[in-house]
Amino acid sequence: MNSRLIVTGTDTGIGKTVFSAALCHALGAVYWKPVQSGLEEETDSEIVARLAQASPQRILPEAWRLNTPASPHLSARLDGVEIRPEEMHIPATSLPLVIEGAGGLLVPLNDKTLFADLFAIWRIPAILCARAALGTINHTLLSLEAMRSRDIPVLGVAFIGEANEDTETTIAHLGRVKRLGRLPLLDDLSPEKLHHSFARNFHIDDFAGVAR
């Protein structure tokens, strides 16, 4: 079976999509964003296609495309629809698959289901993206507890931002989790800069061959 990985995060806007693009490029993976909230600006699928330099065949269509950039449950309500998680089936691919959640781990899909609940059903190894800034210890440890309470397999934590050695070490130790690496913030972000930075700061063997 090919690698299948979930990319989730401690919060929205922390860099999951940029990390996902780097990971897709490194693995030659297919990308899938099940729920896209907000269509006026460049979507996450479009960002990944550009930064990963991925062909259209490697960017799968979203299961739900919602107009308002908000939590999926609210965005769906404003569009007059309800997200039905039971209808979201993991696509079969011949290549590795990277699945990116929307917002943070506990973002609601509807009035009953959180993204974490869907991940618990899928049981695919998940990468938790976390800031390296002040406050991230609490956010990251809480997210890890939420994942483990649902038996979501945790591959490790990917930090995003400026280096904070003590914070990263503390999270790895207290969270009993693998520290996968840290993706620094990049000025004038380009595909080439992103690919080079990922290769310097992560070990591809930590991601390759992971399957459930």
Swiss-Prot record:
ATP binds at residues 13-18, 100-103, 184-186. It holds the Pfam family AAA_26. Keywords: ATP-binding, Biotin biosynthesis, Cytoplasm, Ligase, Magnesium, Metal-binding, Nucleotide-binding. It catalyses: (7R,8S)-7,8-diammoniononanoate + CO2 + ATP = (4R,5S)-dethiobiotin + ADP + phosphate + 3 H(+). GO terms for molecular function: ATP binding; dethiobiotin synthase activity; magnesium ion binding. Its cofactor is Mg(2+). It is found in: Cytoplasm. Substrate binds at residue 37. InterPro entries: DTB_synth_BioD (IPR004472), P-loop_NTPase (IPR027417). The active site is at residue 33. It comes from the Bacteria. It is an enzyme of class 6 (ligase). Mg(2+) binds at residues 17, 100. Catalyzes a mechanistically unusual reaction, the ATP-dependent insertion of CO2 between the N7 and N8 nitrogen atoms of 7,8-diaminopelargonic acid (DAPA, also called 7,8-diammoniononanoate) to form a ureido ring. Homodimer. Belongs to the dethiobiotin synthetase family. This is ATP-dependent dethiobiotin synthetase BioD.
